[in-house]
């Protein structure tokens, strides 16, 4: 009877032993982190629609590493670093998530779908009533972006790479995804993964950060509304959205797909297209967000994240 090579029979274990202690430790850490994300999503501490599929994807991708025919380590989920057309077409017939990643994630389509869904939930009435207050709040939200650029540059990243990393500070996942594709495509995977981990952990830790940073006497202040918000007619909101979309696309063409998607969602909301509204605000938004979590999870491959060219981002 021939001896059974368990390392070959169970390749997940075999690749763990053959990959070196650094990579093996990273795989174990990411598996444990994935399990933690699943638990925190189940408890409702983090957003379950993103964190549960993301955590399960992290577990599966780091446990399911195998030895490919050419002797390298790989998986049967996807390869985000493919650029050759022939290799990409061959891989799309083998790796089951490669078509989803290539046709929706790496070209920004899934980000546009999410923005479209967000648009259906967005009431532009406050922006109409208080445009300057809205701009001020937006600038405050982007403070982290401006502060991160010089720090990233000091770590050796180029200006475009620094700008892509800095977008994480704006706490806008789809915008991070879209910007990294435009400015630093070679860092797209680690930037996107770090961004959504940061957003999820910030969401879960936000109440504790508020208690830590804001004195109790300020937290006890009750907000008083001096006057009731003005109710704008739907046609005013629709016209405002169309004009604002045109202006923003004219000023910032590189982000025009996101602007179009957002204001298309607003237009659906304000025009009374009930069936389209139900679809965009429901299945499209939640389905895209769920698949975003799945793809983010399987992109958390230890071998990919520990690449020397991407360590500085992580």
Q: Where in this protein do the model-derived segments appear?
A:
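Transmembrane alpha-helix boundary signature
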Residues: 63-98, 119-128, 150-159, 303-304
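Hydrophobic transmembrane alpha-helices of secondary-active transporters
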Residues: 102-128, 265-268, 285-307
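Membrane-embedded hairpin module used as a gating/binding unit in multi-pass transport
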Residues: 196-273
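Conserved small/polar residues in nucleotide/adenosyl-binding loops
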Residues: 312-313
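Hydrophobic mid-bilayer segments of alpha-helices in multi-pass membrane transport proteins
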Residues: 29-32, 48-60, 112-114, 192, ...
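Small-residue-rich segments of transmembrane alpha-helices in multi-pass membrane proteins
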Residues: 55-62, 136-149, 169-176, 285-299
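Alpha-helical membrane segments and immediately flanking helix-loop junctions
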Residues: 103-108, 115-124, 135-147, 151, ...
């Amino acid at each position: 009877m021939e001896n059974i090579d368990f390392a070959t029979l169970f390749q997940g274990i075999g690749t763990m032993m053959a990959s070196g202690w650094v990579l093996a430790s990273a795989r174990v850490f990411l598996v444990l982190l994935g399990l933690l994300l699943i638990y925190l999503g189940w408890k409702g501490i983090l957003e379950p629609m993103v964190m549960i599929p993301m955590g399960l994807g992290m577990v599966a991708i780091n446990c399911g590493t195998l030895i490919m025919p050419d002797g390298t380590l790989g998986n049967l989920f996807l390869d985000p670093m493919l650029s050759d057309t022939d290799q990409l077409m061959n891989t799309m017939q083998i790796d089951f998530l490669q078509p989803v990643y290539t046709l929706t994630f790496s070209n920004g389509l899934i980000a546009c779908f999410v923005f479209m869904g967000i648009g259906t939930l967005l009431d532009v009435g406050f922006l109409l009533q208080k445009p300057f207050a809205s701009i001020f709040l937006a600038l405050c939200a982007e403070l982290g972006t401006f502060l991160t650029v010089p720090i990233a540059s000091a770590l050796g990243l180029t200006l475009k790479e620094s700008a892509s990393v800095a977008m994480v500070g704006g706490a806008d996942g789809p915008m991070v995804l879209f910007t990294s594709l435009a400015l630093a495509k070679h860092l797209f995977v680690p930037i996107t993964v770090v961004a959504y981990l940061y957003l999820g952990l910030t969401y879960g830790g936000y109440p504790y950060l508020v208690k830590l940073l804001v004195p109790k006497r300020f937290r006890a202040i009750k907000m008083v509304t001096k006057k009731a918000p003005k109710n704008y007619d739907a046609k005013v909101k629709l016209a405002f959205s169309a004009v604002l979309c045109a202006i923003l696309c004219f000023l910032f063409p590189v982000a025009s797909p996101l602007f179009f998607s957002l204001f298309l969602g607003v237009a659906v909301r304000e025009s009374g297209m009930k069936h389209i509204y139900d679809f965009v605000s429901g299945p499209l938004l939640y389905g895209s967000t769920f698949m975003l979590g799945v793809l983010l999870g399987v992109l958390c491959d230890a071998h990919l994240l520990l690449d020397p060219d991407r360590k500085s981002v992580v």
